[in-house]
Amino acid sequence: MSREMDANEAEPRYVISIAARMLNVQTYTLRYYEKVGIIEPHRSKGNVRLYSDRDIAILQRVKSLVDDMGINLPGVEVILRMMEHVGELQSELERAQEELHKLKRGRE
């Protein structure tokens, strides 16, 4: 079920005008974030930018870091990379804990 939710979160569904409205930013802000590499929206066959729920969540974090905390975009990029790395480490830890649990059950 988690993978299904992940797939739904990654599905591109919002055009740039809708994404901008959801985030209360201008479309040029989203284009700029794409230009500097903070976000990479999916492109339709007609080359229209499409944002997923996951993209929107990332952009909400970016907006919060910039607007609420005053962090500049290079700092935001570092924070986003660190958050991604922490998420990967958490997944790895969960897999290791599951494997350990299986091994313990096998001994009993």
Language-model regions, residue ranges each:
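A generic structured-segment signal
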Residues: 28-29, 38-40, 78-86, 93
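A short, Lys/Arg-enriched interface patch at domain edges and termini
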Residues: 57-88
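Extended, charge-rich alpha-helical interface modules
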Residues: 12, 71, 105-108
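C-terminal regulatory/oligomerization modules of transcriptional regulators
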Residues: 1-6, 84-108
